[in-house]
Amino acid sequence: QINTNNFQIIYPVSFETEAQRVANTLQKVIVEVSKSLNKHPKKISIILQNQSVVSNGFVTLGPRRSEFYTTPAQEFDSQDWLNSLAVHELRHVVQFDKLSGRFSGVPFIETYLGAILNLEVPSWVWEGDAVGAETALTTTGRGRLPSFELAFRTNTLSGIRYSYVKNYLGSMKDMTPGYYPLGFFMTTKLRRDYGTGILDSIMTHVKKNPFRPYNLSRSSKKYTKMNTRQLHD
């Protein structure tokens, strides 16, 4: 393992060279990734899984850690896969720490905290904001890929408009973007129209008013005069 001030990198011995590079990358980007949410995350364990055909990564609070599946995806952007994972998953760490506050890392409580946060904030916010980070802070990112916006662009040019719920949750019948592209465009619109600190303001308000129905939507309404459906439309 590699220990820095901010990360504990856990990896197979055979993967040490790449683990060193991941550690250096994370240390380099942590300030920029956390800046717009005004939250420097606590130290976290990063587990590198190199014996898998899955190309993915995740952050969880029970127990608090992030795992990188290091096999590159066949269809992704032109950037190094581990660099993309570092920025995207680190943004999730910052998001969770922003909302969990002093309860982050507390045994037992953290297990339920993740479920509570996902009730408070819809998936399109988590993922759209993280895609925005990887796009803004790297030379590529999914926000620059034509294939990423394919469904949105096709429907728009065809004069097809679906509801917020359908675009978010998807359809077995019609082509819809899903919550990654939806979230990217909605969070980008928020930053473009209300400044880079708008998500910080909204998430802070969510944190101060826990367990409210439609918490994210109501917090958005406070700062933008629009709930999530109005923002989508």
Predicted regions and their residues:
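Acidic/His/Gly-enriched intrinsically disordered linker/tail segments
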Residues: 63-66, 80-85, 93, 98-196, ...
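Juxtacatalytic substrate-recognition/specificity segment
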Residues: 1-116, 120-122, 139, 215
